[in-house]
Amino acid sequence: MSRIAQTFERLASQGRTALMPFLTIGYPERDSALSLAQALVAGGADMLELGMPFSDPLADGATIQRTTDIALTNGVDIGFCLETVRQLRATGMSIPLLLMGYFNPMFQYGVERFVAEAKAAGADGFIVPDLPPEEADEFHAAAKAHELDLVFLLAPTSTDARIAKIASLSSGFIYCVALRGVTGARAALADDLGDFLARVRQYSQLPRAVGFGISKPEHVAAVAKMAEGAICASALLDYIGNLPAEERATGAQQFVQSLRDAADRATGYQQ
């Protein structure tokens, strides 16, 4: 059983929802992910998504595009992202780490090489928003060979046939996009989110993690009652980016702690 599956299983036994914050590697400073990741874990993160910057992030809104541009200016590439994972593991970090990025840089690097080096570095899986299942054979085979999870995305507009296809290929969990459109903080979640998650459940028993637009404790509380995981990205990055450098780690920890507390209150978990 993968570390991701073990984490979801443990949380399910406790009646808890997985909290999965996102960091762009190389933002705000080149090495910021090392201290920020530690802070997020201290705040209650169960898994981390580590964003690999790419010059044309099609699925991402203004915040992640901006953080990506800064990371690229800071000289971040695939090799640096893999080294970041290695360094996090060297600190003793044991929670699942997922690399999230676009397919083109991975293809240029070499899919088998990338997956093998990610495994050696200590990664647990991948999220590749622009990799459709019809074109994922090589990546899927490499991930399976190295016992890493490959997570696919579903949107509220996905047909039943698409949901069934993703359910047959995804491992670890299914990334359920909460809203139509690109990433970014929103004021409210979609009214039909529960219906969408119920449709996904008809085709898969994998955990469902909800992302895109999750920006505040109230959102996480709502998701915790419907799904097995909640992903927060843009709102966290905006918050970190507005803090003085010396306050970022503490601020990140407090931000995530507020989400953790909201999720646990929603599910009735008490330590």
UniProtKB/Swiss-Prot annotation:
Pfam families: Trp_syntA. One of its GO terms (cellular component) is cytosol. The keyword Lyase applies. CDD domains: Tryptophan_synthase_alpha (cd04724). Pathway: Amino-acid biosynthesis; L-tryptophan biosynthesis; L-tryptophan from chorismate: step 5/5. Its EC number is 4.2.1.20. Keywords: Amino-acid biosynthesis, Aromatic amino acid biosynthesis, Lyase, Tryptophan biosynthesis. It catalyses: (1S,2R)-1-C-(indol-3-yl)glycerol 3-phosphate + L-serine = D-glyceraldehyde 3-phosphate + L-tryptophan + H2O. The keyword Glycoprotein does not apply. InterPro entries: Aldolase_TIM, RibuloseP-bd_barrel, Trp_synthase_alpha_AS, Trp_synthase_suA. The active site is at E49 (proton acceptor), D60 (proton acceptor). GO terms for molecular function: tryptophan synthase activity. It comes from the Bacteria. Tetramer of two alpha and two beta chains. The alpha subunit is responsible for the aldol cleavage of indoleglycerol phosphate to indole and glyceraldehyde 3-phosphate. Belongs to the TrpA family. NCBIfam families: trpA (TIGR00262). This is Tryptophan synthase alpha chain. The gene is trpA.
